[in-house]
Amino acid sequence: PMLEPEYDITAADRAEGEKIMLEAIEEGLVALPEGQQVMLKLSIPKEAGLYGGLTNHPKVLRVVALSGGYSTDDACRELAKNPGMIASFSRGLLQDLRAAQDDAEFDATLSAAMDKIQAASVA
């Protein structure tokens, strides 16, 4: 299964709310049957590394970062501060693509976005 809990990145109490959400996720993981794993899709946390414990949890297959609310550059910069999280930035891949681009420009634009997002995922 994939779980996608989100906390509003513009909320005034974001840091506190993300910590409460993390505690709830950790409690849920304890309740999972042995041998079952989940994938988590989470907004990039305000506190760098907040979800680090989840990335190594035996019941977590992957922790995927959502870029919602951030520009691609900002999302990549924030993701790079969170080792173990990988990007799920579909908007970031597509935002600079245009129907009017010729094949070479389209391919170059897509490649540049992929390179930027991949680099942030392995930082």
What kind of region is each of these model predictions?
Residues 4, 13-46, 62-68:
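Catalytic beta/alpha-barrel core
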Residues 10:
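Extended, alpha-helix-rich binding/interface surfaces that flank or overlap catalytic cores
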Residues 49-54, 71-83:
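Catalytic cores of alpha/beta
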